Amino acid sequence: MAVVSASTPPAPATTLLLVRLLFVNPNTTATMTAAIAEAARAAAHPGTDIRAVNPPDGPASIENDDDERRCVPGLLAEIAAAAAGPDDARPDAYVIACFGDPGLVAARAAVRAPVLGIAQAAMHAAALLSGGFSVVTSMSATVPRAWELAQSYTAGSCLGVHACDIPVLQIDSDPGSFVPIAELCEQALRADGSTAVVLGCAAMARFAHPLRERLGVPVIDGVEAATRLAEALVPLSA
């Protein structure tokens, strides 16, 4: 048995791993980009550096398939610009902060670092935490895409997709959006028999904690889930 004397120097403190994460909001609304960064920083480890950007051109919000198509060039340009930066500033992982996960396949082909979509991160987290989850999203036009992603990512775990039909920018700017979103979450849990809720819009990130308190079930925000998953993946990547 080893004996440590008083003269033995203490073991060095564990150095925090600096992880650089870049969140790309594919729409052009800067207030939403700032809210995404705030949500990510609240979830991140102290050794994680969070940056969030949005393209200068493209849709102001992403609420249908056409918006998703139009946002991809600007999204990919932001990722390419960051990847071409100096080594000490280059992101260790990228997060596409739109629930449709637009451009995810193309972004992964363009860079070596991990690229996460907030829908994929949230749905995998919800599938692990529950016997089945409901998605509560923004506009009805996004419901087919959410179902498509759910079947691709977590087949059988998604029990329903529900739209509050509140525009994305209103969710971002109006705290009063919380009440109808919370009521829809309650309806979804009852109707689907689910035991968790996935928030299907990055603008809903600030509602995750109060919804958990109100509903008493896991409420998964994709920004938070992607932050924590990216932190775990970076040390495992090449």
Regions found by a protein language model. Name each.
Residues 23-24, 88-98, 193-201:
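Periplasmic-binding protein-like
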Residues 141-200:
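Active-site rim beta-loop-alpha module in soluble metabolic enzymes
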Residues 220-237:
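Short, flexible loop segments at boundaries between secondary-structure elements
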Residues 113-120, 156-162, 216-224:
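Short hydrophobic/aromatic-enriched beta-strand-loop microsegments
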Residues 72-131, 135:
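Glycine/small-residue-rich loop that forms an oxyanion/phosphate-binding "nest" at active or ligand-binding sites
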Residues 52-77, 169-174:
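N-terminal beta-loop-helix "entrance" segment that forms/cooperates
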Residues 46, 110-113, 129, 157, ...:
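Short, structured coil segments at secondary-structure junctions
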